[in-house]
Amino acid sequence: MIDQAVTILEAGHDIRCMFTTPKLLESLALRLESMGTTIRKAGITGIFSGGTEFTPQWNRFAHEELLDGAYMTPTYGNTLMGLAASAPSGPHNNYKIAYYAPQPRAAIEVVDFDDPNRIVGYGETGRVKLTTLTKEFFMPGFLERDEGEREPPCEKYPWDGISGVRPYRGFAATTTVGVY
């Protein structure tokens, strides 16, 4: 996969944006470095990256060691939700990643593990519960395969979010992460 990405980047297609997982982004950045270049010098100026292994530590590492000034935003999502963007993160908040669903299309709640009708308090851990509503589709209260901590609204996103996203503990032992 990395060989294909390098071939595409070297082909002169003026590609500036990419979607990837942290593991693939790191592999690509290291490959480019071994070739004497960087993500930014290869033409990439913006990156959407997501996956349950996207931690504040990795976010900091990517910004300090891999990106060479390219913009990256952590993302979280799936086909039912769409793409949840993160609130701004960086040194000001220790690279914390808090995701906010793309309302009004989708809304997430962080609910009690034993009672999916009870929303946990801010900072508390629970399972992700998703409601999706589009012109074509309505999916109320779908329990996702993820868990995390409930985050309060922020200036950019005036609704609840989630941080610390990871596989739901009931499935964690059998969940593969990293390449989707």
Language model features with spans:
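Active-site glycine/GP-rich loop and adjacent strand/helix microenvironment
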Residues: 1-180
